[in-house]
Amino acid sequence: MELIPAIDLMNGKCVRLFKGDFNKRKDFTKEPHEQAKYWESEGAKYIHIVDLDAAKTGSPTNDKSIKDIAKTVNIPIQIGGGIRSQERIEQLFSYGIEKVIMGTSAIENKELVKDLSNKFPGRIIVGIDAKDGKVSTRGWLEQSNILATDLVREFSSFKIASFIVTDINTDGTLEGTNEEFIKRILEITDIPVIASGGVGSISDLLSLVKLENSGLFGVIVGKALYENKFKISEAINVLSSERLTDFDLNNNYYA
């Protein structure tokens, strides 16, 4: 299971939101490309970027930061936020982005996702952000009655790289993941799944490791890293430990 650090961009800065609320935003001082380079130096194998401005408005305003990150690191980057056309995808690929995440556009135009996943096999990720099991769109500002599980079933026949499933109720809380929600997703698809939302400790990561054999490829972590709850290097060492099966999940050492 891969630990994937997140960089959320607003106005060219690294930020974190609480439960997706744009009014509950915390800014961090490090420049985005510097932050990405630090994650890489800590052992990260991937970088996850969300352009929050583009997710909210549909208009990309953080391309300079995105290009700076792509030039700075030598690991694959996946990016989401306001990606709604083939032209935008090709532009991001030209910057050096490895994979793109389609969220709102995937839900509103499934045929577009099907077409793009055929044109760019293995490079399109479908992002499903859910609150109480129902999908939210447009930067989590709009709530639908569509079940996340129904979307996963539908998209599982496409040539997509993976699903990213975010539980909005836990995102930014540092209070642990919605493990039951993740399990439900894994049960209905053979496509790799990346979980997001709620990780606050290494114990939270260890709780998810047992789902790796069910198709959990990775977990996205943001706030816990920014607030130094643990380091990527520490987490990688624990997750790769040969003693993992003997680790007591009730041990509070990493909590």
From Swiss-Prot:
<dbReference type="GO" id="GO:0005737">
    <property type="term" value="C:cytoplasm"/>
</dbReference>
<dbReference type="GO" id="GO:0000162">
    <property type="term" value="P:L-tryptophan biosynthetic process"/>
</dbReference>
<dbReference type="GO" id="GO:0000105">
    <property type="term" value="P:L-histidine biosynthetic process"/>
</dbReference>
<comment type="similarity">
    <text>Belongs to the HisA/HisF family.</text>
</comment>
<dbReference type="InterPro" id="IPR044524">
    <property type="entry name" value="Isoase_HisA-like"/>
</dbReference>
<dbReference type="InterPro" id="IPR011060">
    <property type="entry name" value="RibuloseP-bd_barrel"/>
</dbReference>
<dbReference type="InterPro" id="IPR006062">
    <property type="entry name" value="His_biosynth"/>
</dbReference>
<dbReference type="InterPro" id="IPR006063">
    <property type="entry name" value="HisA_bact_arch"/>
</dbReference>
<dbReference type="InterPro" id="IPR013785">
    <property type="entry name" value="Aldolase_TIM"/>
</dbReference>
<keyword id="KW-0028">Amino-acid biosynthesis</keyword>
<keyword id="KW-0368">Histidine biosynthesis</keyword>
<comment type="pathway">
    <text>Amino-acid biosynthesis; L-histidine biosynthesis; L-histidine from 5-phospho-alpha-D-ribose 1-diphosphate: step 4/9.</text>
</comment>
<dbReference type="InterPro" id="IPR023016">
    <property type="entry name" value="Isoase_HisA-like_bact"/>
</dbReference>
<feature type="active site" description="Proton donor">
    <location>
        <position position="129"/>
    </location>
</feature>
<feature type="active site" description="Proton acceptor">
    <location>
        <position position="8"/>
    </location>
</feature>
<dbReference type="Pfam" id="PF00977">
    <property type="entry name" value="His_biosynth"/>
</dbReference>
<dbReference type="GO" id="GO:0003949">
    <property type="term" value="F:1-(5-phosphoribosyl)-5-[(5-phosphoribosylamino)methylideneamino]imidazole-4-carboxamide isomerase activity"/>
</dbReference>
<protein>
    <recommendedName>
        <fullName>1-(5-phosphoribosyl)-5-[(5-phosphoribosylamino)methylideneamino] imidazole-4-carboxamide isomerase</fullName>
        <ecNumber>5.3.1.16</ecNumber>
    </recommendedName>
</protein>
<keyword id="KW-0413">Isomerase</keyword>
<keyword id="KW-0963">Cytoplasm</keyword>
